Amino acid sequence: IFDFIKMFEKIELGAEFSIVGNSENVNISNKNIKFFGYVADPKSLINIYDEHNITVLPSYTEATPYVVDESLARRRPVIIFEDIEYIIRNKKGIFVSKRDINSFTEKTKYIMENYKEIQKNMEKNVLPTKKSMIKQISDIIKTENS
């Protein structure tokens, strides 16, 4: 996440970036970056998705990232990086960027300029419903807390 934050701070998109998840030693002084921390409540997590336009998954490695399905279920496009492009698996609304400012800016602008069309296309995805998403998140939280 820190590599992405460094890159984001150099981008001139007039955008805000929010971080959700466990992370120690996060010291963010940029007013355009907000840190939520770990969010256990499924409804709060859904609200966070709904309050944002794009999800960015800055991971270098991933197995089956729930954040992608959660974002797509809320019809929020996702930007991932080349390292993990194998996770796309025919899903609409996932965009691959190189890990550089120009590529990321280009993808972000494309998504924002075509947002409604992208969201419409994302309806073709077979994804969890809101109810099943809440259940999946709740089950994960229960498992991690036991």
PLM features per residue range, with description:
Residues 1-10:
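A conserved mid-protein helix/loop that constitutes part of the nucleotide-sugar donor-binding site
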Residues 46, 65-73, 85-87:
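Short alpha-helical segment that forms part of, or immediately flanks, the ligand-binding pocket
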Residues 46-52:
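Short alpha-helical donor nucleotide-sugar binding micro-motif in glycosyltransferases
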